[in-house]
């Protein structure tokens, strides 16, 4: 990371990978001066998005091996034909059902709550709070030590209608959220 920022004369490096949630403690330890943002949104909507991505990448990969090979090569195994659950101790094993992805959301964020809450260099970012809240945006800029009054008008994401969600999973994910 230091070589990349040095080479391009940049102060910041952005790594967007859904599986970074698993690595947040490690990343924080090897980059103690870093600022880590952890974006999250309504858990059922986020899980729905992951399921849709999983289905999309499976479909794309049927006709193009490069997609699967490339995603595997760069370590993106959070959906698609190379999918590996973030946590394997699960109740819902059918990757094509929403409950599986909600359970993965719960296991991912539940595991990380203490780490997130006990590190001053980690800031969770709630998508729903970001929409229409200039004050919340300024909090993020302040955390990142960015001196700017620029405001990006974040748009509300389309809500997917949800069917067949395990009520206990739903309750648990919203408690964490």
What are these regions (language model features)?
Residues 25-26, 138:
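Active-site phosphate/pyrophosphate- and oxyanion-stabilizing loops and adjacent acidic/basic residues
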Residues 12-16, 124-126:
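Short catalytic-loop micro-motif centered on adjacent basic/acidic residues
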Residues 5, 28, 116-117:
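N-terminal cationic-hydrophobic initiation segments that often serve targeting/anchoring roles
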Residues 20-23, 108:
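Amphipathic coiled-coil/heptad-repeat helices and related helical stalk/stem segments
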Residues 8, 31, 119-120:
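A structural signal for short coil/turn segments at secondary-structure junctions
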Residues 51, 58-177:
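PAPS-dependent sulfotransferases, especially Golgi type II membrane carbohydrate sulfotransferases
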Residues 1-14, 78-87:
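PAPS-dependent sulfation machinery
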């Amino acid at each position: 990371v230091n070589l990349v920022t040095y080479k391009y004369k940049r102060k910041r490096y952005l790594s967007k990978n859904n599986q970074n949630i698993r690595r947040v403690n490690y990343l924080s330890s090897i980059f103690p001066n870093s600022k880590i943002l952890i974006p999250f949104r309504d858990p059922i909507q986020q899980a729905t998005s992951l399921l849709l991505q999983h289905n999309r990448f499976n479909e794309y990969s049927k006709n193009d091996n490069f997609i699967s090979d490339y995603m595997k090569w760069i370590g993106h195994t959070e959906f698609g034909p190379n999918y590996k659950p973030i946590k394997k101790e699960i109740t819902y094993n059918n990757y094509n059902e929403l409950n599986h992805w909600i359970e993965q959301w719960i296991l991912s964020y539940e595991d990380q709550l203490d780490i997130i809450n006990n590190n001053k260099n980690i800031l969770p970012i709630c998508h729903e709070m970001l929409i229409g809240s200039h004050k919340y945006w300024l909090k993020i800029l302040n955390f990142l030590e960015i001196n700017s009054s620029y405001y990006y008008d974040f748009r509300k994401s389309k809500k997917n209608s949800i069917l067949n969600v395990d009520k206990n999973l739903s309750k648990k994910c919203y408690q964490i959220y």
